From Swiss-Prot:
This is Lipoyl synthase 2. It comes from Prochlorococcus marinus (strain MIT 9313). Pathway: Protein modification; protein lipoylation via endogenous pathway; protein N(6)-(lipoyl)lysine from octanoyl-[acyl-carrier-protein]: step 2/2. Its cofactor is [4Fe-4S] cluster. It catalyses: [[Fe-S] cluster scaffold protein carrying a second [4Fe-4S](2+) cluster] + N(6)-octanoyl-L-lysyl-[protein] + 2 oxidized [2Fe-2S]-[ferredoxin] + 2 S-adenosyl-L-methionine + 4 H(+) = [[Fe-S] cluster scaffold protein] + N(6)-[(R)-dihydrolipoyl]-L-lysyl-[protein] + 4 Fe(3+) + 2 hydrogen sulfide + 2 5'-deoxyadenosine + 2 L-methionine + 2 reduced [2Fe-2S]-[ferredoxin]. The keyword S-adenosyl-L-methionine applies. Its main location: cytoplasm. The gene is lipA2. Belongs to the radical SAM superfamily. Lipoyl synthase family. Keywords: 4Fe-4S, Cytoplasm, Iron, Iron-sulfur, Metal-binding, S-adenosyl-L-methionine, Transferase.
């Protein structure tokens, strides 16, 4: 049997996964989609829009925006929700990737860029230099472009907890010295579901990263995101929002998890738009400076808007 059709523990389709009306949307103009896809492929790049099968990619492409995925297309983690390739040896670092991303940004005429990456636990700096080199290349062409980063947790490589925290902090320091306009790291889900959803990451490692970012660079806003529909309860979502505020996280995104394929963790529930509206009100009352909450919201959606 082909590996692409091999059954997994998630190979059943639950009735709850039939898309409700509020999650159905047009994909956008075919010509606009093709134009953006050709530009990305022509520069031998990856975008999280395509790799993650984002439901907003038609809208974002139509607006001439994209979130660039750095470090190749293979991740060293194996999160149960993510469409990005995993479970294979990571790719060799492409020394020309930063220049190609910068060229694409220039060709697209972007004013606000989001850079994210696969996890690169195989590298000594866990991929930090991939971010900083790409940021430098973009600014060399246009120093006025604003750049947001959406990063892995930069955790690992050291067995001792204290040394692991120190290593994470050193990697983060190197990234923040490049002065992104926003530092984004997603918790993805509530604490109870972390091991099921985010294999290789933990709730507290992520919170420690966000806390350190605020301490090291208080002028750079921090941001995090949650996917709903994985089996969490509303009380747990509120607790997670409170935990994010406890480390002074200033921006938050809340969106519906959509299953990329039968090989991924199933949708447990489709949250109603009113639920997202109510959670947005809670988040605002908790003191978040920016809240994006809706079924189709993703961490980079309308990222450049105040």
């Amino acid at each position: 049997m082909s590996s692409t059709h091999r059954p997994t523990q998630y190979s059943s389709i639950l009735p709850a996964e039939r898309l409700p009306e509020w999650l159905r949307r047009p994909i956008g103009s075919v010509s606009q989609l093709e134009q953006m896809q050709q530009l990305v492929k022509g520069n031998h790049l990856h975008t999280i829009c395509e790799e993650g099968r984002c439901p907003n990619r038609g809208e974002c492409y139509a607006a001439g925006t994209a979130t660039f995925l750095l470090g190749g297309s293979i991740c060293t983690r194996s999160c149960a929700f993510c469409q990005v390739m995993k479970g294979q040896s990571p790719q060799a670092i492409d020394p020309l990737e930063a220049e190609r991303v910068a060229d694409a940004v220039q060709q697209m005429g972007l004013r606000y860029v989001v850079l994210t990456s696969v996890a690169r636990d195989d590298l000594p700096d866990h991929g930090v230099s991939i971010f900083t080199e790409t940021m430098a290349a973009i600014r060399q062409r246009n120093p006025l472009i604003e750049i947001e980063v959406l990063t892995p947790d930069f955790w690992g490589g050291v067995a001792d907890l204290a040394k692991a925290l120190e290593a994470q902090r050193e990697r983060l320091t190197q990234l923040l010295m490049a002065a992104p306009v926003c530092f984004n790291h997603n918790l993805e889900t509530v604490e109870r579901l972390q091991s099921k959803v985010r294999r290789g990451a933990t709730y507290h490692h992520s919170l420690s990263l966000l806390a350190a970012a605020r301490e090291l660079a208080p002028n750079i806003p921090t941001k995090s995101g949650l996917m709903l529909g994985l089996g969490e309860e509303q009380e747990e979502v509120v607790q997670t929002l409170e935990d994010l505020r406890s480390v002074d996280c200033q921006r938050v995104t809340l969106g519906q998890y959509l299953r990329p394929s039968l090989a991924h963790i199933p949708v447990h529930r489709y949250w109603h738009p009113e639920d997202f509206k109510n959670l947005a009100e809670v988040a605002c009352k908790l003191g978040f400076a920016q809240v994006r909450s809706g079924p189709l919201v993703r961490s980079s959606y309308h990222a450049g808007e105040e």
